[in-house]
Amino acid sequence: MSKQATLFDFSIKKNESKEQTNQESVEVPKQTANRTKIEWIKEAEDGKVYFLLQVDYDGKKSRAVCKLYDKEGKKIYIMQDESGHKPYFLTDIDPDKVNKITKVVRDPSFDHLELINKVDPYTGKKIRLTKIVVKDPLAVRRMRSSLPKAYEAHIKYYNNYVYDNGLIPGLIYKVNKGKLTQLNPELKGEEINEIKKAFADADEMTKETVNDWIPILETEVPDIKRVSLDIEVYTPNRGRIPDPERAEFPIISVALAGNDGSKIVLALKREDVNSDFSKKDGVQVEIFDSEKKLLARLFEIIREYPMLLTFNGDDFDIPYIYFRALRLNFSPEEVPLDVVSGEGKFLAGIHIDLYKFFFNRAVRIYAFEGKYSEYSLDAVATALLGISKVKLDTFISFLDIDKLIEYNLRDAEITLKLTTFNNNLVLKLMVLLARISKLGLEELTRTEVSTWIKNLYYWEHRKRNWLIPLKEEILVRSNQVKTAAVIKGKKYKGAVVIDPPAGVYFNVVVLDFASLYPSIIKNWNISYETIDIDECTKKVWVEDETGEKLHYVCMDKPGITAVITGLIRDFRVKVYKKKAKYSNISEEQRSLYDVVQRAMKVFINATYGVFGAENFPLYAPAVAESVTAIGRYIITTTYKQAEKLNLKVIYGDTDSLFLYNPTKDKLEELIKFVKQNFNLDLEVDKSYKYVAFSGLKKNYFGVYPDGKTEIKGMLAKKRNTPEFIKKEFAEIKNMLASLNSPNDIPEVKNKLEIKIKDIYNKLRNKGYNLDDLAFRIMLSKPLDSYTKNTPQHVKAGLQLRAFGVNVLPRDVIMFVKVKSKDGVKPIQLAKISEIDIEKYVETLRTTFEQILKAFGISWDEIVSTISIDSFFGSKK
C-alpha cells in the first residue's frame, strides 16, 4: 500500500475516536522463528553459472548463504557455504593473554584462536594479530567489549564473508562445491586499450585496481524476473492507516504487476459494495469469497518470482500480509514472507522496497538530479514516469470492486514501471551500485550512501590484507585542525563563498570545477593514512588561501582514498561518459554505460561529504580540513586570476564561479590557467539570460535563454511551503522569465509590486482556503519519541491521535497556523476563522522579500502603501 501525498485526505468526526477504544483489545498475532518445514529456494547446481544477488546468514545452519539468479531459467537459487568460514574479530593481544580472558574463552560460542599477519595501512609493514574465531555472529558483539582493542568487530558477518572471499554482488559466478568462481566478460582489444589509455599515467596500485574494476563496469545486468505488489485494506474509519502488527482488518485487494507482462488483481467479494467489474485487456482478475483463499493464491503467485517489489513494503504491505496471515490461522511455514528487524523479507527470493531506495538523498540528487522532491509513490512516479495514481473522490473502503481494481492495479503498475522505464534504468542502477559498494541488493537499497562507501573501502582494505583501523586510532593520528570553523557545529573552516551583490545581472556564465573535491583527493594523494604521517620521506605541505601550512601529505605511496576516488572519477569522465554517447553500439549497451556513469557519479559526489562526516568510521579531521583548504586556495587563486583578466566575478560558492558578461577568449584563458596550475578541469556549466541575486549566499533566481528558471535557496522551493505561496510564486516566476533586457526592469518591477499587494490583500481578507494555507511535513519517527522538543507537525499529529487517527512515521501531516496554545492545528480540525494571519504574513514576507531585494523593492514600503491606500479607501 503506497502512501498518498498525505494520510489524511478526508475529514474525520470526533465520535470516530471510539473505534480506538475497541481496537485496544485486539490481540497482536505472535511472530515465530520456526520456519523449517518449507524450503522456499532450491539449492544451486554444481557447475552452473549464476548472478550473485546477495549473501545472507542462515542462523539455523550457522553458515553464509549466497542468493543466486539464473538468467536463463529466471529463477533464484541458494548456495550454502561449504568452506567452514566462521565469524571472527581481531585483537593486538597475544593468544596466551586472550586465553586468560574468561568472558571470551568460556563463552559458549567461542571456537578457537589463530595468529595471523596483517598489513599496517600507515607503514606498509606486517603486524601480528590474534584472530578470535566464534561459532555465531552475536558472540562477536558480546565479546568485543572484553578486550582493550577489538578490530573489525563491528562488521556484519555476511559482509565479512563477502570481503574474505572477494565476492562482488551483481557479478557472474560459477558454483563449484560450495564455492563461487568469478567469470569475467570477454572484451575486445580496442575496449581494453581504451581503458588502459585512460589510466596510462596512473600509479601501479591504481593500474592493478583498474583491472579488477573492469568486470564490475562491463558485465551485463540481467533483466531479473520480478513482480510488484500492492495491497488495499478495509478500514472502518476515514483517515486511518491500519496497524500492520495488529492486522485486524481484512485485505480487500492485492494487485501484482510482473515484468513478464502479468497483471493480476485478487479481490475479496463483499456484500457492502458492488462486486461487478469490467474486464480489462491483459488484466487477470480473481474474486474470492474468503480472505484466506485470497492470501493462499497470493503466496502461490509470488513464489514464481525471484524478486518482489513494493513501495513502502517494509513498513506496511509485507508486515500486514504476514501478521494478517497468522491471524487467519496460516502457520508461519506456509507464509513466504517474514518481518526481521523492521524489514519485510521475501523468503522465496529478495524483496526491494523502492520507497527506501528513492528516499536515499544521494540517489535523488546525483542519479536523478533532484527531479522529485517528495517521496510518495505519486510524487516519484509523476516526476520520473509522468504517471500518477488514480485520483479518488471517496474512501477506499467505500469503492466498488471495479474502481478498487483500477486504483490498486495502477499502484502496482507504477511500482513496477519505476524499475523498467528507460531500459530498466533503476534496476541496472541498483545492480551497478551493489557491484561498486560490494553490498547485496537488499542491504544496498535500504542503507545510506555512507554505508555504501564504508563497505567499498572495507572490501578494498581486506583485498590488500590491510588492517581496518579503529576510528579512535585514526583520530589520534589526524585529529589536529588548524583552521576555525565559520559555520557553527563544524570543526574546521569549510568552502570559500564569494558574497553576491543584490541586483539583476544579464548574461551570467557559471564556471564549474568538475568534481573539485574528488579531484583534490586524487591529485594531492589525500587519504587517512597519508596525512601527517611521521614514517615518510617525501612530504608535501597543504597550504590554504592565506598561505598558512596546515598539514603535510606523504607521497611515498598512493593513498587508498586517492586511488579509489580517482579511479571512479576517471572511469566516469574518461571512459563511460564518452561510451554512453557512442552511436556505433546497441541501444542496450549505450543504456548500460549511461547507468554506469550515473552510478559512479553517486559515489564521486558523495565521497567528500562522507569522509568529512564525524560518524564515518574512517573519518580523519585533518583529511577533511586539507581538502577544503586546497579548495579555498584554488577558488581564491582562480578568482584573483579572473580579476587580472578583467573578468567580473559576481558570486562564487565551493566549486563554481559566476561571471558577469564574460568574453569567450577571456573564459578560455581562465580555463587554461586552471588546467596548467592545478591539473583541474574548469568547465562552462551553464549560461543564464539573467540572474537575480538577493544579496544572500546560496540564494538566487536564474533564468535561462529558453525561459526556463532555476531557483536556489528560496523558500518557495521548499517542500513544506504552503500551496498558496507555491502557486503565487509560480505566477511571479513566469512573470520574471519574460524579462529580456535591463530596459524591461521598470515594467516588471511595477507588475511585481502590484502582484505582491494583491497576494497580501487576499491573505488579509482570508481569500485562501485551508488546503492553500496548509504546511505539509512528513513525520520521521513515532510521535512519542519526540521528547526534548515538539515540532509543529508533531503537535498537529498529537491532536489527530486524540481524535482517533493512527499517526505513523512517514505520514505527511497537513496543518495550519492558528491562534491557540499550540499555535497549529491539523487541517481536518481547523476552521478558516482560526487562522493566525500575522504568521502567514511573515511567511509571505520571508519568501518574497528575497526576490524583491534583487529588484530594489522594499517589502516595508509595499506594506505601508497598502495601509495608506486602505486608510484613505475607508474614508470615502
Swiss-Prot record:
SUPFAM superfamilies: DNA/RNA polymerases (SSF56672), Ribonuclease H-like (SSF53098). It catalyses: DNA(n) + a 2'-deoxyribonucleoside 5'-triphosphate = DNA(n+1) + diphosphate. Coiled coil: none annotated. GO terms for molecular function: DNA binding; DNA-directed DNA polymerase activity; exonuclease activity; nucleotide binding. Gene3D superfamilies: 1.10.287.1390, DNA Polymerase, chain B, domain 1 (3.30.342.10), Helix hairpin bin (1.10.287.690), Palm domain of DNA polymerase (3.90.1600.10), Ribonuclease H-like superfamily/Ribonuclease H (3.30.420.10). This polymerase possesses two enzymatic activities: DNA synthesis (polymerase) and an exonucleolytic activity that degrades single-stranded DNA in the 3'- to 5'-direction. Belongs to the DNA polymerase type-B family. This is DNA polymerase 1. It comes from Sulfolobus acidocaldarius (strain ATCC 33909 / DSM 639 / JCM 8929 / NBRC 15157 / NCIMB 11770).
